[in-house]
Swiss-Prot record:
PANTHER family: CYTOCHROME C OXIDASE SUBUNIT 5B, MITOCHONDRIAL. GO terms for biological process: mitochondrial electron transport, cytochrome c to oxygen. This is Cytochrome c oxidase subunit 5B, mitochondrial. This protein is one of the nuclear-coded polypeptide chains of cytochrome c oxidase, the terminal oxidase in mitochondrial electron transport. Disulfide bonds: none annotated. One of its GO terms (molecular function) is metal ion binding. Belongs to the cytochrome c oxidase 5b family. InterPro entries: Cyt_c_oxidase_su5b, Cyt_c_oxidase_su5b_sf. It comes from Vulpes vulpes. The keyword Nucleotide-binding does not apply. Residues 1-30 form a transit peptide.
Length: 128
C-alpha cells in the first residue's frame, strides 16, 4: 500500500513540475522579437543594478562619464572624492598628447597650471 501512495505522490509531483519545453516557451515569450534577449532581459547582479540606477539618473558606482562643465570659475568641472584631496589629469587641448597632473584640494575651485580650466573637489559617498 505504501508503494501505491508513493507512486501517486510522484505522479502528482510530475504534474506540478513544468517540463523543459514549457520553460523554454515561456523564456522565448519574454525575449525581444527574433529570439535574442535584450540587455534588460539578460542582465543580472551588479550589471542589472547599474542599469536600473542609470534609468533613474543615478551613478552609484561612479562608472559613467562625468558631466562636462564650462570649466570657468563660476562653472568648474566637479571632481568627486572620498578624501580631502585628489590627483587630477587635464588634457588641456583636444589634440594634446600629454596629460598635466596636479593635486586638487577641498575648498575653492582650482585652475589647471597649464590651460587655466577650473576644477572643484566635491564629496562623494561610496555605495555600500
Amino acid at each position: 500500500m505504501k508503494r501505491g501512495s508513493a507512486a501517486l505522490e510522484v505522479r502528482e509531483l510530475k504534474m506540478q513540475t513544468p517540463t523543459a519545453s514549457c520553460v523554454l516557451s515561456t523564456q522565448r515569450a519574454n525575449f525581444a522579437k527574433g529570439g535574442v534577449p535584450t540587455d534588460d532581459e539578460q542582465a543580472t547582479g551588479l550589471e542589472r543594478e547599474v542599469m536600473m540606477a542609470a534609468r533613474k539618473g543615478l551613478d552609484p558606482y561612479n562608472i559613467l562619464a562625468p558631466k562636462a562643465a564650462a570649466g570657468t570659475k563660476e562653472d568648474p568641472n566637479l571632481v568627486p572624492s572620498i578624501t580631502n584631496k585628489r590627483i587630477v589629469g587635464c588634457i588641456c587641448e583636444e589634440d594634446n598628447s600629454t596629460v598635466i597632473w596636479f593635486w586638487l584640494h577641498k575648498g575653492e575651485a582650482q585652475r589647471c597650471p597649464s590651460c587655466g580650466t577650473h576644477y572643484k573637489l566635491v564629496p562623494h559617498q561610496l555605495a555600500h
